[in-house]
């Protein structure tokens, strides 16, 4: 029994480490401006790139310069496009392993490398036409068709701002919570914090889609909120 317990603990530790073993990740290759770019470490299991890519190929690596200790996160499928809805990758030290393909030069590529599930999701980001805030902390509550419209930046269509009151409303469900939607209803487009009940004043990360986590107020007040949809960042401040 003790041996079985120890075996289970070892297996569990291995699973936990698999999502945390990469301290940093890079992309290198002909498709990468400047030849190499460091990925943003959003969490222990999520590395992200948002920016320009050229026509060519790229490799996801553990080092900026390829050497004997470099590991490659190479696609399982041959000729894998960086734009995809989730493709599996495997880890190798083989410098001749398959690369990710970029077939169109664009300024707004965005992809996530998930180290826990060993998948890469990529897209050419298209600016949204609308963005709303809704929830128990807003005056309109959780009602579809009543959410508050954010203002799109004229010079950068990926930037949205909103200023207004957020406070706890005791007479509604989840009275201090809120989130952002790409339309004046709950589906299909939405953005969420990485963790439930995140304080928007303390964490500037957000993710597109996924589980229905929400922001929760730590203080009532008049808020000014700016969202960068492309870079998946949010900045909030209390103005009064």
Predicted regions and their residues:
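Positively charged n-region of N-terminal signal peptides that target proteins for export
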Residues: 1-4
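Eukaryotic intrinsically disordered, low-complexity regions enriched in proline/serine/threonine/glycine
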Residues: 238-240
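Aromatic-rich carbohydrate-binding modules that target alpha-glucans
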Residues: 21-57, 63-88, 125-172, 183-207
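Residues within well-ordered beta-strands of beta-sheet-rich folds
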Residues: 50, 110-112, 132, 163, ...
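Hydrophobic h-region of N-terminal signal peptides that target proteins for export
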Residues: 9-18
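Short tyrosine-centred short linear motifs in exposed loops/low-complexity segments
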Residues: 96-119, 174, 211-233
